């Protein structure tokens, strides 16, 4: 879409009074979330309190595991649970997570809480800015504030700020990796390194970047990820030995599987296809099922990304193949509601700027896609608070329908973009110019 036309469309948002109102709405959203986090603050404890979850993910997944790592205690092992007030050892994150969060483990917990809340808020603002800039747009001050506020009020944005999960970091890394995969491989590799904190992000991301023919970016990113992981494991091994480190990692894996809240049958937040199917079937899959399903679910998207990448005009994060990649990452393997932040940048591009060319996707498909991607952002029905107040039967049809809606919408969105990629792959190359490739458009 033409930038001058977009400037005219969004001119009202840049009026000073409108900007002030938008800023007020943004500040109210951040303040209200901060107040809720304070009122329902999760005190350090060896048991999980579902009624007080304020910054619980930051405490249990970032602060104490990173503190343990810095002090030479294996954050994946039961030894961490014995030493710190935490209900469960760390999931199988890459050690890179503990390296880059190390500065946050230096101050006292309350001070670190404030710093991380502000950091998470800033990253939501960065995602809004990335959605505009990666659609090759500029000078949309009012729109940026509006999008920033939308993210703060959105379901994944709110829960990210409230529980203190580090989702925004993983999302920013993934988007950077996809946006610069064709043009700036080293920067793309750095994005991969940031996304490598959680295997459920980086593993499908690597495969899809390869299918997109971003070979140099993958090579650089793999080198950085392996180096970062080895440095972290080497640090832990220096306090014990490699076998103890491996044993501790296995303890963390078993602790995750032993947590009933992680079962698809019990959760109200799962987005991935296996999670949705397992909920309906009352089935608890194991690691091999998740990994095998991911590989199967990557086949068709990967093949169509390979074919479509030869013809696509927008090779940035808001283009067709990047949108396929983001959706495939979410539906192919274990993900929760907060992970739908991964769709924010493509959603902004598609909804506000028509970032996928009409030659690649008809208007009806783009509008349908924009609505489907908005559902996980706006769906506050699939929350513990609503489900409890509504008194729904966890095994009932209504409960299953509400809690499966996000995953179903993402899967339908994936079908639409895969259909568009297949149509594009059958066309004669539309002569993509070097300038378009360099700009990501």
Model feature map: region roles:
Residues 99, 152, 195, 200-201, ...:
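Hydrophobic alpha-helical transmembrane segments of integral membrane proteins
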Residues 108, 195, 346-347:
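Hydrophobic transmembrane alpha-helices
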Residues 353-441:
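Aromatic-enriched
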Residues 186-212:
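Voltage-sensor/pore transmembrane module of 6-TM cation channels
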Residues 167, 188-189, 239-247, 342-344, ...:
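A cytosolic-side transmembrane-helix exit/cap motif
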Residues 336-353:
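Hydrophobic/aromatic-rich transmembrane helices and adjacent perimembrane loops
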Residues 2-187, 209-340, 397-401, 427-441:
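Primarily membrane-embedded glycan-assembly and transfer machineries that use lipid-linked glycans
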Residues 121, 197-199, 227-231, 375-379:
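Membrane-embedded alpha-helical segments of transport systems
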